[in-house]
Amino acid sequence: MTVITYGKSTFAGNAKTRRHERRRKLAIERDTICNIIDSIFGCDAPDASQEVKAKRIDRVTKAISLAGTRQKEVEGGSVLLPGVALYAAGHRKSKQITAR
């Protein structure tokens, strides 16, 4: 009888962890290259803490400003004709049409 032995895989993670590990290595390399270039030219990299946050708008002001964009004006084109509704509803019984 043959004995089957199960060995461990080369990497115990899944595709997501392997991708994150690969991207982490690339990000570290990119950061070191940027730091070397900045040190050569004497530039300081902007910190993430120096970012200016967008001004918050209260919900009433936001609703008022967006109300005008929701309403679209009809410029023409498909306009409802007065007698179209009489003939459009074929599945309903029409009392006004006598020619059957």
Swiss-Prot record:
N protein regulates the transition from the early to the middle stage of lytic development. One of its GO terms (biological process) is DNA-templated transcription termination. Keywords: Transcription, Transcription regulation, Transcription termination. It comes from Salmonella phage P22. This is Probable regulatory protein N.
